[in-house]
Amino acid sequence: MAFNLRNRNFLKLLDFSTKEIQFLLELSAELKKAKYAGTEQKKLQGKNIALIFEKSSTRTRCAFEVAAFDQGAQVSYIGPSGSQIGHKESMKDTARVLGRMYDGIEYRGFGQSIVEELGTYASVPVWNGLTDEFHPTQILADFLTMKEHGRGKQLHNMTFAYLGDARNNMGNSLMVGAAKMGMDIRLVAPKAFWPEEALVATCQEIAQQTGAKITLTENVEEGVKGCDFLYTDVWVSMGESAEAWDERVALMTPYQINMDVIKQTGNPHVKFMHCLPAFHNDETTVGKEVAEKYGMKGLEVTEEVFESEYSIVFDEAENRMHTIKAVMVATLGS
């Protein structure tokens, strides 16, 4: 399968067809295999890439940098305090400046409208490293990981549940991705934390074409039954106030992924996924504060599940790099 995605932006999965997403996943697997075999060919030789980070990052930044270096490109990191973006210069103007200097631009920051504006005016491929609404590169990594651990199943035959804050960028993006790929997704969350109705309606329309099944439920046992994968994310996202913790912990604790929830799937081969970082113990500054305040060593997932044979979170994290590399090669490569 081959598609010409050259010069395309990668801003959200809604912009891509099922076959185009499948192509990116296949290219990711090929590039991963080549890296392990030492046969990788540099498709981005001589390219210059700007990485704009208005939010801090570990996996996304490292994945873009290593992927670019592997492919022969040079990168410039522009951090939260390292530019005039949004302070003395608009994103529209920034886009037109950077588009003259760079061959591709990654953006990780706030509203989706910002990366959309960047994509409109940059005149070079723009890639969404995360916004408040969507996290499309993470979904490619998730789906590649599911394919690797799916015991021979194709994506359209897989069932997975996302537990927790289903209205955040991960809930939104997993729902869009599942709709595009014909999957059975259950969003298991308090009703106040379901995705916006307009996005759900859009995904339901897509599902009618692809055979996907989208379920929104507050019932954990109902939501996880028969699942191949269980997925969660932090209960409080970057940029939200400290006051949000009290409300979230009270509302989300019933949606924690623990061994009881694993067993409720009825699937001995079920796997646990998380986009990371995760609050699964008290070994971080935030984790320690949470443990002291709420008496919980793990929040969205317990240490027992996170460190168990069910967990594939580090395979998932590695695949950030392979899938991001595929996006850059497909849209910018020679």
From Swiss-Prot:
Carbamoyl phosphate binds at residues 57-60, 84, 108, 135-138, 275-276, 320. It is found in: Cytoplasm. One of its GO terms (cellular component) is cytoplasm. Pathway: Amino-acid biosynthesis; L-arginine biosynthesis; L-arginine from L-ornithine and carbamoyl phosphate: step 1/3. Its main location: cytoplasm. SUPFAM superfamilies: Aspartate/ornithine carbamoyltransferase. PROSITE patterns: CARBAMOYLTRANSFERASE. Keywords: Amino-acid biosynthesis, Arginine biosynthesis, Cytoplasm, Transferase. InterPro entries: Asp/Orn_carbamoyltranf_P-bd, Asp/Orn_carbamoylTrfase, Asp/Orn_carbamoylTrfase_sf, Asp_carbamoyltransf_Asp/Orn-bd, Orn/put_carbamltrans, OTCase_ArgI. Its EC number is 2.1.3.3. L-ornithine binds at residues 169, 233, 237-238. Reversibly catalyzes the transfer of the carbamoyl group from carbamoyl phosphate (CP) to the N(epsilon) atom of ornithine (ORN) to produce L-citrulline. NCBIfam families: orni_carb_tr, PRK01713.1, PRK04284.1. Belongs to the aspartate/ornithine carbamoyltransferase superfamily. OTCase family. Pfam families: OTCace, OTCace_N. HAMAP family: OTCase. This is Ornithine carbamoyltransferase. GO terms for biological process: arginine biosynthetic process via ornithine; citrulline biosynthetic process; L-arginine biosynthetic process. The lineage of its organism: Bacteria, Pseudomonadati, Pseudomonadota, Gammaproteobacteria, Vibrionales. It catalyses: carbamoyl phosphate + L-ornithine = L-citrulline + phosphate + H(+).
